Design a protein with these regions (language model features):
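A conserved beta-strand/loop element that lines the FAD pocket in flavoprotein oxidoreductases
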Residues: 2-13
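Generic secondary-structure signature for well-ordered alpha-helical cores
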Residues: 4, 123-127, 184-188
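Hydrophobic/aromatic beta-strand patches that form the interior of the parallel beta-sheet core
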Residues: 7, 37, 159-161
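Beta-strand segments within the central parallel beta-sheet cores of soluble alpha/beta enzyme folds
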Residues: 11, 131-133, 191-197
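Active-site substrate-recognition segment that forms the wall
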Residues: 13-16, 21, 30-31, 35-157
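C-terminal lid/capping helical subdomain adjacent to the catalytic/cofactor pocket in oxidative enzymes
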Residues: 18, 153-201
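A Rossmann-like FAD-binding core segment of flavoenzymes
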Residues: 24
Length: 201
């Protein structure tokens, strides 16, 4: 609607022209932009490192298992505080969640965490059969639990929006709105200093 284009490509490197315009190399193209934003969730650190900005982004890995066909056992999400897990009824069955770790992007799935989720679910519902699906997701996490939103300290035409922890879907839209206004030179009337990458200098 606004003249943008969606392209699904893997970003490999980011460099800058003599006039500090971002040059982005993907797996299939080379692009030069007036301005660019790194908003790649847990995968953002690779690119922020390339522009010599050491932001201490880590990867909080969350797990879930799925029991197909047992959604009739619950009518609403339940948190079992004593054992530290939750179960949510889905259209396709029950989703069991409740374990995280700092494990990076490349380490394999930790089977002990899957077994723990399965055992906890069967403690609550002994009638559960074999689970159908195991999932591992990556949450971009920073030491102070605040995202990075705003310009790079090293390049005036590069901006950041990542590190939203468990709230990426929740805060992504408002972060994008704030950042787009900032890039366009609009007055946001917000104090964004707590979200600046400068706090890690």
């Amino acid at each position: 609607q606004k003249g943008g284009k969606f392209k699904k490509e893997n970003v490999e490197t980011i460099n800058f022209s003599a006039d500090d315009k971002p040059i982005v190399k993907t797996n299939s193209n080379l692009y030069k932009f007036d301005k660019a934003t790194i908003a790649c969730g847990a995968f953002s650190k690779k690119l922020s490192d390339q522009v010599n900005e050491k932001i201490p982004l880590d990867t909080e890995r969350g797990y879930h298992v799925h029991f197909k066909g047992y959604d009739h056992l619950l009518s609403r999400p339940v948190i079992f505080l004593n054992r530290g897990f939750g179960i949510t009824p889905m259209e396709q069955g029950l989703r069991v969640v409740g374990t995280v770790e700092f494990g990076g992007l490349k380490n394999p799935l930790n089977k002990k965490r899957i077994i723990n989720l399965v055992n906890n679910a069967k403690y609550l519902f002994p009638e559960l059969g074999k689970h159908e699906d195991e999932w591992l997701g990556f949450r971009p996490t920073l030491p102070d639990f605040l995202p990075v939103i705003g310009p790079s300290k090293n390049h005036k035409n590069l901006f950041y929006s990542f590190g939203h922890h468990h709230l990426g879907w929740t805060l992504g839209a408002i972060s994008g709105k704030i950042l787009s206004g900032m890039i366009a030179g609009e007055n946001t009337n917000l104090n964004l200093e707590p979200y600046s990458s400068l706090r890690f200098s």
